[in-house]
Amino acid sequence: KADIFCLQETKLQAGQVELDLPGYLQFWNSAKKKGYSGTAVFTRTAPLEVTYGIGLPEHDTEGRVITCEFPGFFLVNCYTPNAQRGLSRLEYRMVWEDAFRAFLLSLDRSKPVILCGDLNVAHQEIDLKNPKPNRGNAGFTDEERGKMTSLLSAGFTDTFRWLYPDRTGGTADTKSEAKRS
Protein backbone atom coordinates (compact mmCIF):
# COMPACT_ATOMS: atom_id res chain seq x y z
CA LYS A 1 0.00 0.00 0.00
CA ALA A 2 1.23 3.44 -0.89
CA ASP A 3 2.13 5.79 1.94
CA ILE A 4 1.02 8.75 -0.17
CA PHE A 5 -0.79 9.01 -3.47
CA CYS A 6 -1.93 12.04 -5.43
CA LEU A 7 -4.65 12.65 -7.99
CA GLN A 8 -5.07 15.40 -10.55
CA GLU A 9 -8.06 16.51 -12.62
CA THR A 10 -10.46 15.27 -9.95
CA LYS A 11 -13.26 17.56 -11.22
CA LEU A 12 -15.04 17.26 -7.85
CA GLN A 13 -16.44 19.84 -5.48
CA ALA A 14 -16.03 19.61 -1.70
CA GLY A 15 -18.39 16.99 -0.30
CA GLN A 16 -19.37 15.65 -3.72
CA VAL A 17 -17.84 12.24 -2.99
CA GLU A 18 -16.86 10.38 0.14
CA LEU A 19 -14.11 7.82 -0.35
CA ASP A 20 -13.78 5.04 2.19
CA LEU A 21 -10.01 4.65 2.38
CA PRO A 22 -9.19 3.36 5.86
CA GLY A 23 -5.86 4.59 7.12
CA TYR A 24 -5.63 7.55 4.74
CA LEU A 25 -6.12 11.21 5.47
CA GLN A 26 -7.65 13.00 2.49
CA PHE A 27 -6.99 16.53 1.27
CA TRP A 28 -8.94 17.96 -1.68
CA ASN A 29 -8.53 21.22 -3.58
CA SER A 30 -11.48 21.94 -5.84
CA ALA A 31 -11.90 24.53 -8.55
CA LYS A 32 -14.53 27.21 -8.07
CA LYS A 33 -15.90 26.20 -11.48
CA LYS A 34 -17.86 22.95 -11.11
CA GLY A 35 -16.53 19.92 -12.97
CA TYR A 36 -13.15 21.51 -13.63
CA SER A 37 -9.56 20.60 -12.67
CA GLY A 38 -8.92 19.85 -8.98
CA THR A 39 -6.32 17.88 -7.02
CA ALA A 40 -6.29 15.47 -4.08
CA VAL A 41 -3.67 14.00 -1.75
CA PHE A 42 -4.13 10.81 0.28
CA THR A 43 -1.59 10.10 2.99
CA ARG A 44 -1.12 7.59 5.80
CA THR A 45 1.05 10.07 7.73
CA ALA A 46 -0.42 13.32 8.96
CA PRO A 47 1.31 16.33 7.41
CA LEU A 48 2.59 19.10 9.65
CA GLU A 49 0.65 21.53 7.49
CA VAL A 50 -1.44 21.50 4.31
CA THR A 51 -1.79 24.52 2.04
CA TYR A 52 -3.98 24.97 -0.99
CA GLY A 53 -2.79 26.91 -4.02
CA ILE A 54 0.37 28.96 -4.34
CA GLY A 55 -0.74 31.99 -2.35
CA LEU A 56 -1.73 34.17 -5.31
CA PRO A 57 -5.47 34.78 -5.80
CA GLU A 58 -5.13 35.03 -9.58
CA HIS A 59 -3.83 31.44 -9.64
CA ASP A 60 -5.69 29.79 -6.78
CA THR A 61 -9.29 29.40 -8.03
CA GLU A 62 -8.81 26.25 -10.12
CA GLY A 63 -7.77 23.77 -7.39
CA ARG A 64 -4.42 23.09 -9.04
CA VAL A 65 -2.00 22.76 -6.11
CA ILE A 66 -1.92 21.06 -2.72
CA THR A 67 1.22 21.24 -0.61
CA CYS A 68 1.75 18.89 2.31
CA GLU A 69 4.61 19.69 4.64
CA PHE A 70 6.24 16.70 6.31
CA PRO A 71 9.20 16.79 8.72
CA GLY A 72 11.83 16.18 6.03
CA PHE A 73 10.21 17.50 2.84
CA PHE A 74 7.35 19.25 1.09
CA LEU A 75 5.11 17.21 -1.19
CA VAL A 76 3.52 19.36 -3.91
CA ASN A 77 0.71 17.87 -5.98
CA CYS A 78 0.12 19.94 -9.12
CA TYR A 79 -2.23 19.96 -12.08
CA THR A 80 -0.68 22.52 -14.43
CA PRO A 81 -3.06 24.56 -16.61
CA ASN A 82 -3.36 23.26 -20.15
CA ALA A 83 -2.66 25.74 -22.95
CA GLN A 84 -5.84 24.43 -24.65
CA ARG A 85 -6.65 23.95 -28.32
CA GLY A 86 -5.61 26.93 -30.34
CA LEU A 87 -3.29 27.82 -27.43
CA SER A 88 -6.00 30.07 -25.97
CA ARG A 89 -4.51 29.80 -22.45
CA LEU A 90 -0.82 29.78 -23.38
CA GLU A 91 -0.23 33.34 -22.19
CA TYR A 92 -1.88 32.59 -18.83
CA ARG A 93 0.08 29.36 -18.60
CA MET A 94 3.39 31.19 -19.02
CA VAL A 95 2.52 33.59 -16.17
CA TRP A 96 1.37 30.65 -14.03
CA GLU A 97 4.59 28.73 -14.73
CA ASP A 98 6.75 31.60 -13.47
CA ALA A 99 4.64 32.03 -10.33
CA PHE A 100 4.60 28.28 -9.66
CA ARG A 101 8.37 27.96 -10.08
CA ALA A 102 8.86 30.87 -7.64
CA PHE A 103 6.54 29.10 -5.18
CA LEU A 104 8.54 25.86 -5.45
CA LEU A 105 11.84 27.68 -5.01
CA SER A 106 10.52 29.44 -1.89
CA LEU A 107 9.67 26.04 -0.39
CA ASP A 108 12.99 24.55 -1.48
CA ARG A 109 14.87 27.17 0.54
CA SER A 110 13.73 25.49 3.77
CA LYS A 111 13.60 21.78 2.88
CA PRO A 112 13.53 19.47 -0.16
CA VAL A 113 10.50 19.49 -2.47
CA ILE A 114 8.91 16.47 -4.10
CA LEU A 115 6.76 17.65 -7.00
CA CYS A 116 4.30 15.25 -8.54
CA GLY A 117 1.34 15.67 -10.80
CA ASP A 118 0.25 16.38 -14.31
CA LEU A 119 2.55 19.09 -15.61
CA ASN A 120 0.86 19.11 -19.04
CA VAL A 121 4.12 19.20 -20.97
CA ALA A 122 6.21 16.88 -23.08
CA HIS A 123 9.62 18.37 -22.40
CA GLN A 124 11.62 16.53 -25.04
CA GLU A 125 10.80 14.76 -28.29
CA ILE A 126 11.58 11.46 -26.54
CA ASP A 127 8.56 12.13 -24.27
CA LEU A 128 6.10 11.68 -27.15
CA LYS A 129 5.52 8.74 -29.41
CA ASN A 130 4.99 11.04 -32.42
CA PRO A 131 6.69 14.38 -31.70
CA LYS A 132 6.83 15.90 -35.20
CA PRO A 133 3.06 16.27 -35.78
CA ASN A 134 2.65 17.62 -32.23
CA ARG A 135 5.19 20.42 -32.39
CA GLY A 136 3.37 23.63 -31.51
CA ASN A 137 0.35 21.87 -29.99
CA ALA A 138 -0.70 22.44 -26.38
CA GLY A 139 1.79 20.68 -24.14
CA PHE A 140 4.53 20.66 -26.76
CA THR A 141 5.08 24.31 -27.62
CA ASP A 142 8.53 25.84 -27.43
CA GLU A 143 7.22 28.13 -24.68
CA GLU A 144 5.95 25.30 -22.46
CA ARG A 145 9.06 23.22 -23.05
CA GLY A 146 11.18 26.25 -22.18
CA LYS A 147 9.38 26.67 -18.86
CA MET A 148 10.07 23.02 -18.05
CA THR A 149 13.73 23.61 -18.87
CA SER A 150 13.66 26.59 -16.48
CA LEU A 151 12.20 24.40 -13.72
CA LEU A 152 14.89 21.77 -14.23
CA SER A 153 17.60 24.43 -14.44
CA ALA A 154 16.40 25.76 -11.07
CA GLY A 155 17.57 22.50 -9.51
CA PHE A 156 14.62 20.15 -9.84
CA THR A 157 14.91 16.69 -11.42
CA ASP A 158 12.60 14.87 -13.80
CA THR A 159 12.86 11.56 -11.94
CA PHE A 160 11.27 9.54 -14.74
CA ARG A 161 13.81 10.83 -17.23
CA TRP A 162 16.62 10.35 -14.66
CA LEU A 163 15.61 6.71 -14.14
CA TYR A 164 14.82 6.02 -17.81
CA PRO A 165 16.96 8.37 -19.91
CA ASP A 166 16.34 6.51 -23.17
CA ARG A 167 12.73 5.34 -22.86
CA THR A 168 10.54 6.88 -25.55
CA GLY A 169 6.96 8.02 -25.20
CA GLY A 170 6.98 7.53 -21.47
CA THR A 171 6.13 10.83 -19.82
CA ALA A 172 3.37 12.36 -21.91
CA ASP A 173 0.06 10.96 -23.04
CA THR A 174 -3.21 12.46 -24.14
CA LYS A 175 -6.65 11.12 -24.81
CA SER A 176 -7.73 14.13 -26.84
CA GLU A 177 -5.77 13.74 -30.07
CA ALA A 178 -5.26 10.42 -31.82
CA LYS A 179 -2.11 11.61 -33.56
CA ARG A 180 -0.33 11.76 -30.21
CA SER A 181 -0.78 8.05 -29.52
Stretch-by-stretch model annotation:
Residues I4, G23-L25, W96-S181:
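Metal-dependent phosphoesterases centered on the DNase I-like endonuclease/exonuclease/phosphatase
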Residues T61-G63, F70, E91, V95, ...:
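Residues forming well-ordered secondary-structure scaffolds
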Residues K11, Q16-R85:
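Structured beta-strand-rich core segments of catalytic domains in phosphoester-bond hydrolases
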Residues K1-C6, T10:
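Proline-aspartate-enriched helix->loop->beta-strand connector
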Residues N77, L87, M94, L105-D108:
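Active-site acidic/histidine proton-transfer and metal-coordination neighborhood
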Residues G55-L56, P81-E97, K132-N137:
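Surface-exposed cleft-lining segments at the edges of enzyme active sites
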Residues Q8, Y79, C116:
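A cross-family glycoside hydrolase active-site/sugar-binding cleft signature
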